[in-house]
Structure formats: C-alpha cells, structure tokens
C-alpha cells in the first residue's frame, strides 16, 4: 500500500451538537490571547500535528503555543498544561475530551535487515520497548520468551533502531510507511488501532483558547 494509506482514518463519530454550542460560545468570547500549553507525544507532535500547530498559529496570532513532549497525563490533571494529545483507547477518567482520528500500527523492520534474516532462514530479533503500555504489551504478546538485545523508551529512538537493523518492532503506520528504509513485517491488525484523543480538564471545557484548539483540530 502507498505510504501512509492506512495510518490515520477519520473518526466514525462526532460531537457535532456539542461542538456547535462550543463554537457559538467561542465567537462570543474575544479572550483569544495569552498562553496555551499543550502536552503531546513526541512522534505525533513532530510530524502529523506540526501542520495543525502552524495553521493554528496563523489563525490565532495572539495565542502563544507552548508544546511539551510528554507521555503522561499527570501534568494536565495537576493543571500544569491546558491540553493533552494522546494515543490511547482508555483515556483517564480524570479528563474529558474526544477521539479525533484512528491510528493504525504494524510491525516494521529495515528492508535490508529483513532480507538478510530471510536468506539465513532466521527469525528477526525483537526490539524491547518501554515507550508506552500498549507497544510494550503488544511486543510481549508476540515474543514473550524473547531476549531483547536492544531496548528503547521512545518511539523515535525505536524508529532509528529499526533503520539500523537492530530488529523489528511495532510502529504507527504514519511513521513506518513514510520511511523508505523500512518495510512492513506484518499488516496492521484492527485490534492494535488507537484513538488520537484531545484531552483537557473539565474546568477548562469552556475556556476560549481550549475551544479554539478543539474547533481547529475538528476542521
């Protein structure tokens, strides 16, 4: 399949009525100035979200975006950040929000590495991951007894390790399909789909800057 063809699909549901109400409030609230702190995971923030950040900056020049790379919702629940953008199917019940799109994942390896192990009749090595609970769980399910000779706690680091022939690992398809050095070792399985959630604290649901981001992402 073409690069990125299966990686992100529109969500099948929407909160159109709620969003319409929020948009009305947004038009009445002129306080679209100040700082907006967004916590987002590294691989999403530096790739697919960057275009959205750039267009938001142009649409709302008086709002200063502060993007923090983080995989934890703790900073949001403690009010250190205004919005968190997460890949998950089970967002914490302390926060509210909605899933915007579905992100597929597959197992990837370097093209030359996979060719080499196939010629030798060997099984590819698995890269140990500790970047998030779902990637860690999926890896364990596929190679529970496997000894990992390389371990990573960051998806971008895992991507680099795959490129260097250190083994195979799960990656979001928007990352793996876009890299010509990589090849799918397996096709995406729907059970590994994750939602891209925009989360915020309940007290901030009517804040003008938060509403502006929600409306902008929903376009």
Identify the role of each PLM range:
Residues 78, 90-197:
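C-terminal regulatory
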């Amino acid at each position: 399949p073409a690069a990125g063809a299966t990686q992100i699909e529109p969500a099948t549901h929407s909160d159109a009525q709620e969003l319409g109400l929020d948009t009305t409030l947004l038009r009445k609230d002129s306080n679209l100035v100040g700082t907006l702190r967004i916590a987002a995971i590294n691989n999403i923030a530096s790739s697919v979200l960057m275009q959205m950040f750039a267009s938001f900056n142009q649409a709302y020049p008086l709002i200063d975006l502060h993007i923090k790379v983080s995989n934890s919702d703790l900073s949001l629940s403690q009010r250190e950040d205004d919005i968190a953008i997460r890949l998950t199917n089970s967002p914490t019940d302390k926060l509210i929000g909605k899933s915007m799109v579905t992100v597929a994942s597959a197992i990837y390896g370097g093209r030359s590495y996979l060719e080499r192990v196939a010629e030798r009749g060997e099984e590819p090595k698995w890269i140990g991951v500790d970047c998030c609970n779902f990637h860690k769980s999926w890896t364990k399910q596929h190679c529970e007894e496997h000894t990992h000779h390389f371990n990573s706690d960051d998806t971008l680091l895992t991507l680099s390790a795959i490129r260097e022939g250190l083994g195979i690992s799960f990656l979001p398809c928007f990352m793996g399909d876009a890299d010509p050095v990589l090849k799918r070792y397996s096709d995406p399985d729907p059970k590994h789909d994750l939602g891209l959630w925009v989360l915020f604290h309940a007290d901030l649901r009517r804040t003008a800057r938060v509403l502006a981001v929600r409306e902008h992402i929903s376009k």
